[in-house]
Amino acid sequence: MTVVIGLTGGIASGKSTVSQMFRELSIPVIDADIIAREVVEKGKPAYNKIVEVFGTEVLQEDGELDRPKLGSVVFYNEEKRLQLNKIVHPAVREEMNRRKEMYIKEGMQAVVLDIPLLFESKLTSLVDRVLVVAVKPHTQLERLMKRNNFSEEEATARIQSQMPLEEKVKNADEVINNDGTIMGTKTQLQAILKKWNIID
């Protein structure tokens, strides 16, 4: 029986570190962000639909999607943002499901769906267990400022635009506290996977 794990966290909580640890344990990871880029590649159904709805002005000269341009179109327009999500989200969900089923057919012990907005996009039904990577608020703020070269105001605004991390923690099956060392994080992950009978 394959255990489907939903991996999520807050911005700059260190989710990609944990994602990499799963890969090192030979547990396949399906990354929602990568799939979201793939489903809008030139010629794909979602791409065609975007061009139909938003016009060719959201394309680069080579015909590929101009993501920053599309981003600025939907950023200030709630209706257009919802239109875009209506096109992209189902395509991402379908592709994630397809890959998940493939790993289940292969008899994998576990498969990870790495979804930053797992709760916000109401995708918890796709997974059996939810694992949240959490950090203390000041750690999150410091990491985000350092990683993205943000001012404190910018970083705070970005953090506040997401569901609060403590709310995600409340809804998790297990939580990894990622404030300490890489080794400490790895130890926590291994303990959780043992508890779930995924590794010995």
Swiss-Prot record:
Origin species, per record, is: Bacillus thuringiensis subsp. konkukian (strain 97-27)
EC primary class: transferase
Query: What name does UniProt use for this protein?
Result: Dephospho-CoA kinase
Q: Which Gene3D superfamilies match?
A: P-loop containing nucleotide triphosphate hydrolases (3.40.50.300)
Summary of the function given for this chain in its UniProt record = Catalyzes the phosphorylation of the 3'-hydroxyl group of dephosphocoenzyme A to form coenzyme A.
Q: Where is the DPCK domain?
A: 4-200
Give the record's GO CC terms.
cytoplasm
EC numbers, comma separated:
2.7.1.24
Keyword Cytoplasm set for record: yes
Query: What InterPro entries does the entry give?
Result: Depp_CoAkinase (IPR001977), P-loop_NTPase (IPR027417)
> Which BP terms from GO are recorded?
coenzyme A biosynthetic process
Molecular function terms in GO for this entry? ATP binding; dephospho-CoA kinase activity
The entry's keywords: ATP-binding, Coenzyme A biosynthesis, Cytoplasm, Kinase, Nucleotide-binding, Transferase
- What domain of life does the native source organism fall in? Bacteria
Q: Which reaction does it catalyse?
A: 3'-dephospho-CoA + ATP = ADP + CoA + H(+)
Which compartment or compartments is the protein found in?
Cytoplasm
Which pathway does the protein contribute to? Cofactor biosynthesis; coenzyme A biosynthesis; CoA from (R)-pantothenate: step 5/5
UniProt similarity note:
Belongs to the CoaE family.
Annotated ATP binding lies at A12, S13, G14, K15, S16, T17
